């Protein structure tokens, strides 16, 4: 349903209570597992294919990677300002093209439940990180066959950054051990690996690194949010950080910590376990580069133990050269949450001023021109969208949609064009009148609402293959603006294209089904989430499947082209 005007919702406390009940400890402990297909089904996905990697390869004479062609898509944009916008010329697609798409090919990956990564597209090559399969592929955009394959030897965590260093194209990404990989984009050969973690802080690397000149900027998402669910754990120890590495060697240049190292606080849980803090304020997503101001902007999540800090649920500006903190905008103070809070666990200690709502910033801040000024715009899981002055961090405008949730309102980020900001909202269904899943637009200059589309569940003929079809259908994945269209997708696997000016639905496609694949691996789609939507070289690419949080697993990368 399209609405010509936006509406800023008031806060309904019962919504949060009911949603948190859904996030029981049992649910969160299954993060990362597949639900629509069992583990055995995933293992069987490769049966009948003697070697699924070999079956994916292009003919020997068709494996050359031409890096002299145009870079048409990177997750952060070439400038690193994260606009999630590509022009018609850059993408090779017009709004009219996007209103009539057809499937060109599909490739599947065995033992895979989630398609979480954004690709890099250079000319006729799409570089894709099959994170569950521990591999990076250089795929031909026309056919889907592989020109080369890099085996990292362990699961990967992030999307990829692309840069040209000393005349050579490189790809940079992280793995689940906290290591950064640099490989040749032309051949897939490894240049080096190095730790991306900050000292004395063993955190995950989730967000995409950014290449800027001679440096790689690495976000660190340490927090203890998961281990806090263990009642015997002395919660909590780790915290968010940023490291800067030498792009040629991986040597560390500087590091920034969102807070001091945790110490024993003198507090004990209800079961007598000692508590540590401060902790948390993880940086889940990609830093934003502002070369003109020589600044980096990062967004953070909640604290995971007491004492809380001024850097949680915040947007932070750092000096690009030194990592020194320049300013901090905190959207919500005293948000202390860990997995113990989902089931009233002993490590969830609620004080008088504790919010305990888990309202991270899950997506990056976007640096965008709005008339005669620049703004820094970001969406939050509270359902807020914030616009700041990048010089000082001062608030310019703010709007809020609904109550927000621990897995929404805005989960993985927003997109912009020259006139509007577009925010996806992932409120789950069945939560009463305050559930507002959909796509919302705001005029950049003023923050005034434009149009919004309130998505509704569609279970007819689909509920037998969609887990929780009536509740999981909101828009969680990071949206993308191409020319005059906005591309987004639902946790029920539906892909949507909207007219950016009016909100009219231009195209819809159900990806939650089985697919024939170019490499012979059994392919099936599911929830579309994370950073799984991209466009470039005249095509739209979508990763379908996201098995975390009781969502629908899948293992396919889908390529769409304008219908002939």
Task: List the model feature ranges, each with a label.
Residues 22-34:
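Bacterial N-terminal signal peptides
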Residues 238-251, 311-324, 436-447, 554-563:
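Beta-propeller blade signature
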Residues 138, 182, 244, 317, ...:
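Conserved blade-register residue in beta-propeller folds
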Residues 10-25:
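Bacterial N-terminal signal peptides that target proteins for export
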Residues 70-80, 112-135, 153-180, 202-234, ...:
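Repeat-blade elements of multi-bladed beta-propeller folds
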């Amino acid at each position: 349903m399209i609405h010509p005007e936006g509406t800023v919702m008031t806060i309904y406390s019962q919504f949060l209570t009911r949603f948190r009940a859904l996030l029981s400890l049992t649910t969160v402990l299954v993060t990362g597992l597949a639900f629509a297909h069992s583990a055995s089904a995933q293992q069987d996905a490769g049966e009948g294919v003697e070697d699924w990697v070999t079956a994916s390869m292009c003919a020997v004479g068709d494996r050359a990677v031409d890096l002299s062609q145009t870079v048409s898509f990177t997750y952060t944009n070439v400038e690193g300002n994260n606009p999630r916008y590509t022009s018609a010329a850059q993408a090779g697609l017009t709004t009219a093209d996007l209103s009539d798409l057809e499937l060109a090919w599909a490739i599947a990956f065995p033992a895979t439940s989630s398609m979480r990564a954004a690709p890099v597209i250079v000319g006729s090559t799409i570089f894709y990180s099959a994170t569950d399969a521990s591999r990076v592929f250089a795929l031909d955009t026309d056919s889907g066959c592989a020109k080369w394959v890099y085996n990292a030897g362990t699961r990967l965590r992030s999307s990829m950054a692309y840069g040209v260093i000393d005349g050579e194209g490189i790809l940079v990404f992280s793995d689940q051990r906290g290591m950064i990989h640099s490989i040749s984009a032309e051949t897939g050969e490894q240049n080096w690996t190095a730790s991306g973690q900050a000292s004395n802080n063993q955190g995950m690397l989730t967000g995409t690194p950014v290449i800027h000149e001679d440096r790689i900027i690495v976000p660190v998402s340490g927090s203890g949010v998961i281990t806090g669910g263990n009642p015997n754990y002395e919660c909590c120890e780790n915290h968010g950080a940023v490291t800067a590495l030498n792009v040629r060697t991986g040597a560390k240049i500087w590091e920034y910590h969102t807070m001091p190292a945790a110490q024993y606080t003198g507090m004990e849980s209800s079961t007598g376990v000692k508590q540590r803090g401060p902790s948390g304020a993880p940086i889940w997503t990609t830093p934003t580069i502002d070369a003109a101001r020589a600044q980096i902007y990062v967004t953070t999540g909640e604290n995971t133990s007491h004492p809380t800090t001024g850097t949680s649920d915040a947007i932070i500006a750092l000096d690009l050269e030194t990592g020194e903190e320049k300013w901090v905008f905190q959207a919500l103070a005293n948000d202390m949450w860990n997995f113990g809070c989902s089931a009233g666990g002993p490590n969830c200690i609620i004080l008088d001023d504790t919010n305990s709502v888990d309202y991270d910033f899950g997506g990056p801040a976007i640096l965008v021109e709005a008339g005669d000024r620049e703004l820094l715009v970001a969406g939050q899981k509270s359902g807020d969208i914030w616009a700041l002055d990048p010089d000082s961090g001062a608030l310019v405008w703010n709007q809020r949609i609904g109550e927000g949730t621990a897995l929404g309102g805005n989960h993985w980020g927003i997109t912009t064009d020259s006139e509007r900001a577009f925010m996806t909202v992932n409120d789950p269904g069945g939560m009463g009148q305050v559930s507002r899943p959909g796509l919302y637009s705001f005029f950049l200059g003023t923050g005034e609402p434009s149009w919004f589309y309130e998505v509704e569940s569609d279970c007819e003929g689909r509920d037998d293959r969609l887990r929780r079809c009536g509740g999981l259908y909101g828009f969680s994945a990071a949206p993308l603006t191409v020319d005059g269209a906005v591309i987004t997708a639902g946790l029920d696997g539906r892909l949507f294209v909207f007219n950016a000016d009016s909100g009219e639905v231009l195209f819809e496609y159900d990806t939650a089904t089985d697919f024939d694949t170019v490499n012979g691996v059994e392919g099936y789609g599911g929830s579309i989430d994370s950073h799984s939507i991209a466009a470039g070289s005249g095509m739209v690419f979508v990763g379908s499947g996201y098995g975390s949080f009781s969502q629908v697993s899948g293992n396919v990368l889908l390529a769409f082209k304008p219908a002939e």
